[in-house]
């Protein structure tokens, strides 16, 4: 059945598909922001750069195993290994950042950890610049796993899996969506059903109270950073596989948009971050499709301002009560 | 300013006596610190102005540009940021955008771009009013936001500005408004009554005069009712509001004044460089200005001036145009200084420096005996100390990745070092410092620009964890 659509529906569907994949990435980044903010009331500027480091760890695994043109492994285990390495590496990085840059400042004035976070972000960016150089590094996901990469025969990652009204959905886009959904479900279960999840909720609700109840809040905070950074690492590899290119500055804008997603959804709220990510991804896709890519950032920024003015607690957030 | 005879309002006895309980530092550092703390503000200003006024007489044109003009520009930028962050305590991460708006506006009002050539007396006040208005608008949209939200909105605002001038470049009067990635070129020098400031010396003196005027104005502002209200707002917004301080109006005022100063700095920057491009207004300059304000001490005018001088000098030493020799000498001097300051006793510091030197020669000798190819590399070209370093630091030949591994090892070593107890830490300093020298010679010398950003980032983290109030800031006394 054909729906009567006044505008070019193929373009619209294509943009929707792109927006959902992009939104998945933002949702994963936003989760890290929202969890850390919920538990420490700290805005972790370095989170975008943890995502960038995740993308580079994936790149390191890929080039360590023979490079994208002649990998030593089959495609499936290779991609799985990239994901695992990036997630574990980013997770550890997040824990180290928390331990050395934020924990000593737990009792300091509010400005101190923010400035420290800015320093960490800048430090990570430039460390990667020093180690990998300024040029783009490519995952070559177009030919990754192809039987004949020398002649640029497309690999299976960009094979169309199915079509929606003539618009192809590539395998990699499906993988991104499925992995994101899987991680979100796992996270929700972790927070809702496990002991450590309960401790996280308690710490977010009232850190001092949780400490008095015998919860090792420092460990819970470390764990929160670990989980958030694991998600960011996964998002980094997904970015590399989707867009093929990674570079040292990619974390900055992605971090800003991830944060926008967290704010739009309601900071501190896990389902809010997922919803916000989807909204920001779709907005960006439509904006660049209909107005041109150069306006995408400006439009997303406008949305952030608008939401903050109209509903500062975000779509799914609860308004903060101030106790004097 | 006379010493108050009784505690300031809102300060109880324990807090008032806080300074007396502090141990006074001995030696030259302590003397300098005391002088800076007790010299009256006009004396400090006069000392600074007199010293800065002699600069053009003994510096050549290139140095005056790199050291004099840029330091003064950084001071001006730091002063503006100090109003927003230091006095009012608002974390404004879009500050550089105001600098950019000022520079671009001046560029459009006085250049060939649209063929408009306004004199500086007309364009500078207009640009300052314009940036203040933009600051006000940004402040109004985000006035309800708490600290962190404000930070991200302003950070995004700064990024949106760069994207706007770089990519959006809307067409106005048949011409791209901002010139895209190329920016605006052929900007006029500052012109007053038909007289143009074209030589570096003239520009320098104009800038110096501006800085002195702004410093004076800010000093009076910070001592005024408004200045006190800002500090109250910074320390506790809720309590300030309860004391019927008009919190919102003060926030907006801080935003507008900071933005106007940034706009002024932008005008002068554009006229001195005669061209502006989007690359001038990115994240690195933001970090630099923050490093200046934080190093000097948040809220301290003297601190901003000192911070700008220190940061700009280290900046110029690490600039790629400069001969390597200067950077190397500075780096090793700073390493030695850190080593001496890291321990309390001076003799121990001196012993540690000696230990590092011996450690280096021994390591180099061992490496040479065991694996000659690992020490066969040549030191990067350049002057003083090069011959010494050649025999002291391990520089492998033909191992391209060595510098990278050494860098990662250094970061890990420093992190581990901070966790070690007492004497172990002191002992571990020796190999760590030597490792830093290896990283410098194998990795940093080839990319001095990246190296300085890494050092600035680490500086922010380190200062926050060790001394969050900066060099000259007053530590917060918390009453529990």
Regions found by a protein language model. Name each.
Chain A
Residues 1-29, 57, 68-82, 108-112, ...:
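Membrane-interfacial amphipathic/re-entrant helices at transmembrane-helix boundaries
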Residues 22, 165-246, 270-275:
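Helix-loop-helix "hairpin" substructures at the membrane interface of multi-pass membrane proteins
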Residues 38-46, 92-138, 190-197, 202, ...:
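Short loop segments and helix-boundary regions at transmembrane helix junctions
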Residues 69-120, 127, 275-280, 284, ...:
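Alpha-helical transmembrane segments within multi-pass membrane transporters and channels
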Residues 104-105, 113-193, 220, 286, ...:
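Transmembrane helix-bundle core of multi-pass membrane transporters
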């Amino acid at each position: 059945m054909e729906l009567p659509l006044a505008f070019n529906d193929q373009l619209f569907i294509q943009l929707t598909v792109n927006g959902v994949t992009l939104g998945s990435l933002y949702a994963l980044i936003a989760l890290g922001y929202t969890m850390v903010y919920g538990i420490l009331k700290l805005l972790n500027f370095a989170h975008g750069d943890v995502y960038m480091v995740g993308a580079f760890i994936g790149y390191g695994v890929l080039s360590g195993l023979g490079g994208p043109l002649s990998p030593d492994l089959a495609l499936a285990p290779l991609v799985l290994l990239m994901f695992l390495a990036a997630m574990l590496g980013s997770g550890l990085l997040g824990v180290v950042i928390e331990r050395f840059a934020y924990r000593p400042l737990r009792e300091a004035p509010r400005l101190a950890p923010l400035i420290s976070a800015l320093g960490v972000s800048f430090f990570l960016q430039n460390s990667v610049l020093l180690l990998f150089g300024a040029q783009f590094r490519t995952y070559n996901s177009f030919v990754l796993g192809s039987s004949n990469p020398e002649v640029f025969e497309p690999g299976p990652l960009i094979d169309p899996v199915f079509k929606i009204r003539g618009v192809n959905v590539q395998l990699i886009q499906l993988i991104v969506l499925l992995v994101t959904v899987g991680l979100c479900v796992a996270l929700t279960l972790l927070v809702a059903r496990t002991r450590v999840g309960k401790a996280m909720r308690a710490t977010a609700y009232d850190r001092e109270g949780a400490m008095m109840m015998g919860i090792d809040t420092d460990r819970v905070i470390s764990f929160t950073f670990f989980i958030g950074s694991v998600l960011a690492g996964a998002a980094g590899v997904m970015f590399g596989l989707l867009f093929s290119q990674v570079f040292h500055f990619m974390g900055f804008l992605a971090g800003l948009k991830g944060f926008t997603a967290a704010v739009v959804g309601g900071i501190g709220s896990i389902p809010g971050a997922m919803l916000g990510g989807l909204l920001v991804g779709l907005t960006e896709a439509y904006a660049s499709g209909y107005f041109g890519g150069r306006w995408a950032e400006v439009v997303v920024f406008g949305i952030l301002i608008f939401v903050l003015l109209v509903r500062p607690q975000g779509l799914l957030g609860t308004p903060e009560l101030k106790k004097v | 300013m006379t010493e108050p005879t009784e505690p300031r309002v809102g300060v109880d006895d324990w807090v008032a006596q806080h300074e007396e309980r502090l141990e006074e530092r001995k030696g030259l550092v302590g003397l300098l610190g005391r002088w800076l703390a007790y010299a009256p503000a006009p004396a400090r200003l006069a000392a600074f102005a007199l010293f800065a006024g002699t600069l053009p007489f003994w510096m050549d044109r290139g140095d005056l540009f790199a050291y004099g003009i840029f330091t003064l520009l950084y001071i001006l930028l730091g002063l503006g940021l100090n109003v927003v962050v230091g006095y009012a305590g608002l974390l404004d991460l879009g500050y550089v955008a105001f600098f950019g708006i000022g520079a671009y506006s001046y560029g459009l009002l006085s250049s060939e771009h649209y063929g408009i050539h306004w004199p500086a007396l007309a364009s500078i006040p207009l640009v300052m009013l314009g940036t203040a208005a933009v600051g006000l608008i940004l402040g109004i949209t985000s006035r309800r936001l708490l600290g962190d939200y404000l930070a991200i909105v302003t950070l995004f605002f700064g990024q949106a500005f760069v994207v706007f001038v770089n990519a959006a470049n809307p067409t106005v009067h048949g011409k791209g408004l901002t010139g895209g990635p190329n920016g605006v070129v052929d900007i006029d020098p500052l012109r007053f009554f038909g007289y143009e400031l074209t030589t570096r010396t003239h520009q320098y003196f104009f800038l110096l005069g501006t800085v002195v005027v702004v410093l004076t104005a800010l000093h009076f502002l910070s001592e005024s009712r408004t200045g006190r209200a800002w500090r109250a707002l910074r320390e506790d917004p809720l309590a300030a509001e309860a004391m019927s301080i008009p919190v919102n109006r003060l926030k907006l005022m801080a935003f507008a004044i900071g933005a106007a100063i940034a706009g002024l700095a932008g005008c002068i920057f554009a006229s001195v460089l005669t061209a502006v491009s989007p690359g001038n207004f990115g994240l690195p300059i933001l970090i630099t200005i923050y490093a200046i304000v934080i190093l000097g001490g948040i809220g301290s005018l003297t601190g901003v001036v000192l911070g700008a001088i220190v940061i700009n000098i280290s900046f110029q030493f690490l600039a790629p145009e400069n001969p390597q020799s200067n950077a190397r000498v500075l780096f090793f001097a700073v390493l030695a200084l850190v080593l001496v300051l890291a321990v309390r006793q001076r003799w121990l510091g001196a012993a540690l420096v000696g230990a590092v030197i011996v450690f280096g020669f021994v390591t180099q000798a061992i490496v040479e005996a065991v694996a000659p190819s690992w020490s066969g590399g040549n030191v990067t070209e350049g002057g003083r100390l090069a011959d010494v370093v050649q025999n002291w630091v391990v520089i492998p030949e033909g191992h391209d990745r060595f510098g990278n591994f050494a860098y990662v090892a250094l970061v890990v070593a420093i992190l581990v070092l901070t966790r070690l107890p007492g004497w172990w830490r002191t002992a571990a300093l020796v190999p760590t410092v030597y490792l830093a020298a290896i990283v410098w010679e194998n990795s940093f010398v080839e990319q001095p620009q990246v190296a300085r950003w890494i050092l600035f980032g680490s500086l922010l983290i380190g200062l926050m964890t060790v001394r969050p109030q900066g060099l000259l800031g007053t530590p917060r006394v918390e009453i529990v």
